[in-house]
Structure formats: C-alpha cells, structure tokens
Amino acid sequence: MRHLRYIHDKNYSGFCIRKNSTALMKSGGLFSSAVDMYRKVDPGIKIKLKDQKIVFSSGATVSFSHYENDKAADLYHGLEMSGIFYDESSQASESHIWWLISRLRTKAKMSPSIWLSCNPDPSSFLRSWVDWWLYPETHPKFGLPDPEKNGKIRYILRKNGELFWGDTREELIEKFGNPR
C-alpha cells in the first residue's frame, strides 16, 4: 500500500520481497493482491508477469522478487531501489536486510526507505530492533507494544556491526559523527 504514495513519480522503483517467490506469485499472494489494489487506483497499469512487475501510467514501477539465500543478493546488485517492502521479514537473515538497505537510493522525489512486516518471533534478529517500542521486562505487560510509543520514529546507526539507536538523527551524529 505504501508504494501508492509515489506512483505519480516516473522515477519511483518500488520492490516487494519475500524469502521465496512462490508465496509472492501464487493466487491470493502478494502479487495478485497488489494488482487488484493498484488497478483500482490506476486502471492503466501494465502487468509484466514474466518480470513480476507492475508499471503505472506515470512509469513508476513496483517489482516483486525473492531473497531466498546469499546468492540472491546478485538480483539486487547495482540497483537503485526507491522503496522496499519485505513481507514476513522475520524469515530473512539480518545480513539480507542490510544488503537491501545498502541499495536504497533513488532519483524519485522521496526519501528512500525500507519497511518490514513480521509476526512476533522472540528469536528473530528483529526483536532487538523493536525492543524500544515494547514494554520492558519489569512491566506486567512485558513484550507487548507500548501504546505511548506508537508512531514514534527512531534512528539507527550501524557501526562495525553494532547497532546504535537515537531519538533524532542529530543525536546519533553528535555521538558518532556524520557518516558521510
């Protein structure tokens, strides 16, 4: 759905990714659901089944692909990806997510971003990414989302494989310097 924000920008190149493409392309999967939804917004979309891609009237695209193993990184090498949606990201490896993040760059008039969907899995690497938004261990509702933190944006810096979080981009720059 988020891709719809940018479909009027011919330079937008969105991606929907799952661990394997079977779940993406089966009837009732993400691709067929997206076609139904996108067609309501832009009846002139072109469906490129072979390429697993939807092309909007403006020229903006949303492609559907997989990231099943390390070799699949080659699918994204050299690409400029405006927006990435990774469905069921708890099935992904953390290194795959970071590789995709490294592909985020665009000529579209938007800030490139990635968004991840997942079901709760305390053994997933994502647990440490969402901990701040959850009630702490000392709270009776430990592990559940804290509604007071709903919608709050946090910033992440990865340095030498370690993650650092801040409430603002400036906070992280002040602590660690500007990475650019």
What residue ranges belong to the model's regions?
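Phosphate/NTP-binding elements of NTP-utilizing enzymes
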Residues: M1-R180
